[in-house]
Design a protein with these regions (language model features):
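Conserved C-terminal beta-signal and adjacent last beta-strands/turns
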Residues: 185, 191, 239-241, 246, ...
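Gram-negative outer-membrane beta-barrel transporters
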Residues: 424-430, 515-524, 537-614, 685-687
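Extracytoplasmic beta-strand/coil segments of soluble accessory domains associated
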Residues: 34, 49, 66, 70-109, ...
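N-terminal periplasmic accessory domains that precede
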Residues: 65-68, 87-92, 101-106, 120-123, ...
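Periplasmic-side early beta-strands and strand-to-turn transitions of outer-membrane beta-barrels
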Residues: 142, 154, 162-163, 169-171, ...
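Membrane-embedded beta-barrel scaffold of Gram-negative outer-membrane proteins
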Residues: 301-305, 374, 456, 460-464, ...
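N-terminal Sec signal peptide and the immediately downstream disordered periplasmic leader
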Residues: 1-62, 66-70, 185, 291, ...
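Short acidic/polar hinge/loop motifs at secondary-structure boundaries
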Residues: 109-137
Length: 688
């Protein structure tokens, strides 16, 4: 008996040791907070959720958040026409400027109210200060309100306990890329302190665009103004900083993000603009009080946050010599427009959780927000009908901010309240029910419910049945844009709406093998689209699909991860497949720690063909498969972490789709967006 007990104890100790070692290598992915507002096991969360840790990010060689998100099942990172900004396509929903995805940093929305997305000056997000990324696919408005439509992304930054000391790092590589950063985590008396500063610069990939909108105009007008064939303008200068202070139940955070000389990609009007640039500045701060035992059976959380966003531009919409709009008018220096906008956001909210009722966990919350574009400015050398001022030179640029603004300053207030109950119906069964009401001062109220039934069918099997609705608030430009012949706002817009039904199962058939699969069906209505140059609620879209993911540790030093996604979305008006989203998506990665302190990570990303919009004469855009490779040494005992990554190892000609302009006699970018070719990066960091 003693021998049996000894062997059993040894086996348990070995299992615990293996689990601890895996957690150290890959990070703790067993819990998620984004699904309910409190920390719960991922397998029992009332949502389809993915957690990516800092260890995952380092192993895959990612340098920007977009590279991290591309690995999430059901999520593909496409590109938009203006500034090559990322478009997070979740479950086939790829509309407008991508306002259907809510981006949070430490729970604070990064939404800019003018466009409803992350802003034209987003300029990427570096990963050095990211502790983990939590993603839910599906509606989240019952907890998070507006824009938690197709999904929610929450980026959680590092605290003093994550850093524990000082780290300095350097990176260099292709496209004249250079980055330097410093992280520090420690104590200042009784206060936990963490700080982060990063400076970066890149010229970006400069793959050639063979033809652009000016090429089509040249063919129509008999001019030779186009700069195509020519390179994409994808450079930027970056500055990021953050400070995190916590004491007992209080936490104060402030973050600064500046992007300068952001390239305009293929041009904001789909005409190459090699000298065009965008500047943005984002300043956020928040003060949070959290007490998990404020009274018997009660926990409370209160938060005040502010965000200030500035976006300035210097743009040549069409190049010198163009006759893009009037055959008799040649623009000496091109069609120049420089819109600028300033936003501020203020939020206050709180929640309370009560556990005094047996088998129930009740969460109540309320809050208010003020969001406004408080200042706009524009200088340009053309009138509202696109006729030129003077000869169309830079000397003819005038300030039209007071006489013909693209939008006058606007603001709105919203109030919200919500309730959620996590009810343990019987052993192994949990029902989560929630309801949230949001009232906006401009378009009124909307109420969104959620229901989630989770059954732990066996010690290694969990099933979920989920239902929820969500809404996407109209942006300020969609409501109030003026003095633009191709875009006019509509103050009578209603929010976009979606309802989603999901079924999910997670299964761990072996101690080192985890499998997950989910099926979904969604229905969208009141889609906001441009109809005859005016924004209107027009259109419906339905979709269904599945997502499969697996993690397998065949040996102690090897981990295989992968996922497959399928979606079929249909535009109800046309009966055709919804445009510009891949039907199939596969991601595979191997992490092999082949000797102590060293690892190699190859990964493959396959994106299937993407259907075109109705009326687009081009064939569907072909798919692509890229391979990345990262070699990394983490000599923790000596403080060094060195990595080399090769992205797009085989230099595949990968492309993302460009839009089709209905009624235009030519396609602005007929050969789509070329993605970066092969690139190599080397980085080294030292911790002490």
């Amino acid at each position: 008996a003693c021998a049996v007990m000894g062997l059993g104890g040894q086996a348990v100790a070995q299992a615990v040791s293996d689990e601890d070692e895996l957690a150290l290598a890959y990070g703790d992915k067993s819990f998620v907070s984004i699904a309910t507002g409190s920390r719960v096991p991922v397998s029992r969360a009332p949502a389809v959720a993915t957690v990516i840790t800092a260890q995952d990010i380092a192993s895959m060689g990612a340098t920007d958040l977009d590279e991290v998100l591309e690995t999430v099942p059901g999520l593909h990172v496409a590109r938009e026409t203006q500034g090559f900004a990322p478009v997070y396509v979740i479950r086939g929903i790829n509309l407008g400027f991508n306002p259907q995805v809510l981006m949070l940093i430490n729970g604070i929305p990064m939404t800019t109210v003018y466009t409803g997305n992350r802003g034209g000056g987003w300029g990427g997000m570096p990963v050095e200060n990211i502790a983990r990324v939590e993603v839910i696919r599906g509606p989240g408005s019952a907890l998070y309100g507006a824009d938690a439509f197709s999904g929610v992304i929450n980026v959680i930054t590092k605290t003093s306990s994550d850093i524990q000391g000082t780290e300095v790092g350097l990176r260099g590589g292709s496209f004249k890329t250079g980055d330097a950063w410093i992280l520090h985590g420690g104590k200042w008396g009784a206060v936990d302190v963490s700080g982060y500063l990063r400076i970066g610069q890149t010229d970006g990939d400069r793959r050639t665009v063979q033809a652009d909108a000016q090429t089509g105009s040249d063919a129509q007008r008999g001019t030779l103004a186009s700069r195509a064939p020519g390179p994409i303008n994808n450079g930027r200068d970056s500055t990021d900083g953050a400070l995190d202070l916590s004491l007992d139940n209080w936490r104060f955070r402030v973050a600064y993000k500046e992007r300068d000389d952001i390239g305009t990609g293929t041009g904001v009007a789909s005409a190459l603009d090699p000298g065009g640039e965008i500047y943005s500045q984002t300043i956020t701060s928040d003060l949070t009080y959290e007490n998990r035992n404020i009274a018997e059976d009660w926990a409370a959380n209160m938060q005040v946050s502010v965000m200030h966003y500035t976006e300035l531009t210097d743009l040549t919409l069409f190049p010198a010599g163009t006759r893009a709009f009037y055959p008799s008018e040649v623009y000496a220096d091109g069609i120049i427009g420089n819109p600028a906008k300033w936003e501020r956001h203020g939020r206050v909210g709180g929640s309370a959780t009560y556990t005094g009722f047996k088998l129930h966990r009740i969460r109540l919350g309320l809050g208010a927000e003020r969001e406004e574009v408080y200042k706009t400015r524009e200088t340009k050398n053309f009138r509202a009908d696109f006729s030129r001022i003077g000869t169309g030179s830079r000397a003819d640029i005038i300030d039209v901010s007071d006489t013909a603004p693209f939008m006058r300053p606007q603001g709105r207030t919203k109030r919200y309240l919500y309730a959620q109950d996590e009810w343990n119906l019987v052993k192994d069964w949990t029902l989560t029910a929630g309801l949230r009401n949001d009232h906006y001062s401009d378009f009124g109220s909307t109420t969104n419910p959620r229901l989630a039934l989770v059954w732990e069918a066996a010690y290694n099997v969990t099933t979920k049945l989920l239902y929820g609705t969500a809404f996407r608030a109209p942006s300020m430009s969609e409501l109030y844009a003026i003095n633009n012949p191709v875009i006019t706002g509509n103050p009578n817009l209603r929010p976009e709406k979606i309802q989603t039904l999901e079924a999910a199962v997670s299964w761990q058939p072996l101690p080192k093998l985890q499998l997950g699969m989910n099926f979904f069906h969604y229905e969208m209505k009141d889609i906001i689209r441009l109809i005859s140059s005016v924004y209107q609620n027009n259109g419906q879209q339905k979709g269904n699909g599945l997502e499969f993911e697996a993690t397998w540790d065949p040996m102690k030093d090897v981990r295989l991860t992968g996922n497959y996604s399928y979606q079929r979305s249909v535009d109800e008006a046309t009966g055709q497949a919804a445009a510009n989203a891949p039907r199939h998506h596969v991601y595979l990665r191997t992490n092999w720690r082949f000797t102590p302190g060293w690892s190699v990570d190859p990964q493959v990303n396959w994106v299937s063909k993407r259907p075109r919009e109705q009326g687009d004469p081009r064939s569907d855009l072909k798919g692509y498969a890229t391979v990345d490779l990262t070699l990394r040494t983490d000599r923790a005992s000596r403080g060094w972490d060195v990595a080399m990554s090769v992205r797009n190892l085989f230099d595949v000609d990968a492309r993302e789709p460009t839009p089709y302009d209905v009624g235009q006699p030519f396609i602005s970018l007929p050969y789509d967006f070329p993605l970066p070719g092969r690139s190599v990066y080397v980085q080294a960091s030292y911790q002490f």
